[in-house]
């Protein structure tokens, strides 16, 4: 997935609104994913799945921090996400469809917290970015 200059600018603009809320937004995205797609819980058998649990908040922060790094290195997503790609493919063996589930939940979080900023163009750019991230994260599966 090729991101245009406009896409990159749009992603950086909307992501700037999340930069102070990485843990909060990350936890919310994970909670939504676990609720909407309960099969994703299989990768977290040791987690306390209750609302606002410390484990979900900590992992949500990790997820959104990784996305933050990807935004900061938007011109080199494979380089920025190489370690995570290998981890998820070889060690954790996460089913690739789960990245799409999480991407959808990330979009929902932005829609809830920043409805006026998430114009159709920004929404499309953020979706393309999350698809590009998913493609990189699944690239080591092949």
UniProtKB/Swiss-Prot annotation:
Please name the GO terms that the record assigns under molecular function. Answer: haptoglobin binding; heme binding; iron ion binding; organic acid binding; oxygen binding; oxygen carrier activity; peroxidase activity
Q: Which PROSITE patterns match?
A: GLOBIN
Statement: the UniProt record of this protein carries the keyword Nucleus: no
Endpoints of the signal sequence: none
Entry binding sites for heme b: 88
GO BP terms: hydrogen peroxide catabolic process
Domain of life of the organism in this record?
Eukaryota
Q: In which tissues is it expressed?
A: Red blood cells.
- What is the protein's given name? Hemoglobin subunit alpha
Task: Give the originating organism.
Answer: Alligator mississippiensis
Protein's gene: HBA
């Amino acid at each position: 997935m090729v991101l245009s200059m406009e896409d990159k600018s749009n992603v950086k603009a909307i992501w700037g609104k999340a930069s102070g809320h990485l843990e909060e937004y990350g936890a919310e995205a994970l909670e939504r994913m676990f609720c909407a797609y309960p099969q994703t819980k299989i990768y977290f058998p040791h987690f306390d799945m209750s609302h606002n649990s410390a484990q979900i908040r900590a992992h949500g922060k990790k997820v959104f921090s990784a996305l933050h790094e990807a935004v900061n290195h938007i011109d080199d997503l494979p380089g920025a996400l190489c370690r995570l790609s290998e981890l998820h493919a070889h060690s954790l063996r996460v089913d690739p469809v789960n990245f799409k589930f999480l991407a959808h939940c990330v979009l929902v979080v932005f829609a809830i917290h920043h409805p006026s900023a998430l114009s159709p163009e920004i929404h499309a750019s953020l979706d393309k970015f999350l698809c590009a991230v998913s493609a990189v994260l699944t690239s080591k599966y092949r």
